[in-house]
Structure formats: structure tokens, C-alpha cells
């Protein structure tokens, strides 16, 4: 899903995208990035066995802060509801960079479920200047939180977009049952 957003920006001359990887699910991410032709410019290499959420978030903020200082982005697109997405939004906000939240407005109404994703969604939403909501329902959730209508755009679902893109490829499988 992130790959579609990055690839579309890469194909638009108005944007100079700077993909950053946290290192989470490295092998799976490499396969997907290869499929969509994406090479992260930075890899934070955050993931290590036995670390807790606070360590992940603090290391993410520190690593992203260095990248923000080096790259001087105009905008940070924080996608999803992971703790590293929240860390990216906070690091950018602390540096005065505009934050765009992709997949904004998803809500369960229970700050502890799912944990920590629901809290991450709300925290990102507090610092985002533009909220890209996947559905009209997500937009309504944001409106109930007093986000201005002019700051919300319903964009559709990035997972479905990526699935439709991949389904359109002329892929040959070795196993005839998959054709």
C-alpha cells in the first residue's frame, strides 16, 4: 500500500520523494519494494529482538530527526497507524514540517483497542495538517473530532489500490493452478 503512494509520487515531477524504511519486516518489504520498483533512500534499521514500544519510538524519532535535518522536507506523509508512523509525524511536527496523514480517520472508539494503533491514529491526527481518509466514514470520524472539512480528502483505500495494480500485471506462475 505504501508502495503505491511512493511510486505515484516518484512518477510526478512536482515531487522529490524520499522513502524511509524502519527495517520492520525487512525480507517481506524488500520483495514488495522490488515488485513496485521502490528503493528506500534511508533505512533506520530499528528492529531488534526484545525491544519495547518506547525504545522503538525513541529510536525512530532520533533517526527520523537526523533525516529531517539532512533532507529538509517540505512535507512528511505519515501512512497508517504504526508507532513508527506516529514517530515520523511527531519528529516532523517538532521540526516545523507539514504533516499529511494517509489512512486518516480510522477509529474504533477505544483508545486501548487495537493497542497501540488507536492511540497512534489519534496522535498523528492531532499534528496533521492534511488528512487523507480512505472512506466517507473515516472522514466523518475526523469531522466529529472537529477537523475542518477543507483539511480532509477522501482518497480511497491504498491496500485495495495496490491489490488492483498487482492484479492487472501479466504475471506468469510456475504452478498452473495459480494461472
Model-assigned labels for residue ranges:
Residues 68, 72-74:
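Proline-aspartate-enriched helix->loop->beta-strand connector
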Residues 77-95:
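An aromatic- and histidine-rich active-site surface loop
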Residues 20-27, 127-179:
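A nucleotide-sugar donor-handling region in carbohydrate enzymes
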Residues 2-6:
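Short, small-residue-biased leader/transition segments that mark boundaries at the very start
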Residues 117-130:
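Membrane-proximal helix-turn-helix segments that form the acceptor-binding/catalytic region
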Residues 100-115, 129:
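A short, histidine- and acid-enriched strand-loop-helix "catalytic/donor-clamping" loop
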Amino acid at each position: 500500500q505504501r508502495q503505491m503512494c511512493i511510486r505515484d509520487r516518484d512518477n510526478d515531477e512536482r515531487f522529490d520523494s524520499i522513502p524511509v524504511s524502519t527495517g520492520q519486516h525487512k525480507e517481506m518489504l524488500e520483495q514488495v519494494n522490488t515488485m513496485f520498483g521502490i528503493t528506500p533512500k534511508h533505512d533506520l534499521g530499528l528492529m531488534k529482538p526484545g525491544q519495547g514500544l518506547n525504545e522503538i519510538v525513541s529510536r525512530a524519532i532520533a533517526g527520523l530527526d537526523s533525516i529531517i535535518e539532512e533532507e529538509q522536507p517540505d512535507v512528511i506523509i505519515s501512512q497508517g497507524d504504526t508507532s513508527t508512523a506516529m514517530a515520523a509525524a511527531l519528529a516532523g511536527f517538532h521540526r516545523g514540517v507539514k504533516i499529511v496523514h494517509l489512512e486518516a480517520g480510522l477509529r474504533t472508539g477505544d483508545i486501548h483497542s487495537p493497542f497501540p494503533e488507536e492511540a497512534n491514529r489519534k496522535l498523528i491526527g492531532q499534528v496533521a495538517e492534511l488528512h487523507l481518509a480512505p472512506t466517507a466514514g473515516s472522514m466523518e470520524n475526523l469531522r466529529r473530532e472537529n477537523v475542518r472539512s477543507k483539511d480532509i480528502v477522501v482518497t480511497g483505500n491504498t491496500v485495495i489500490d495496490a491489490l488492483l495494480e498487482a492484479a492487472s500485471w501479466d504475471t506468469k506462475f510456475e504452478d498452473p493452478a495459480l494461472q
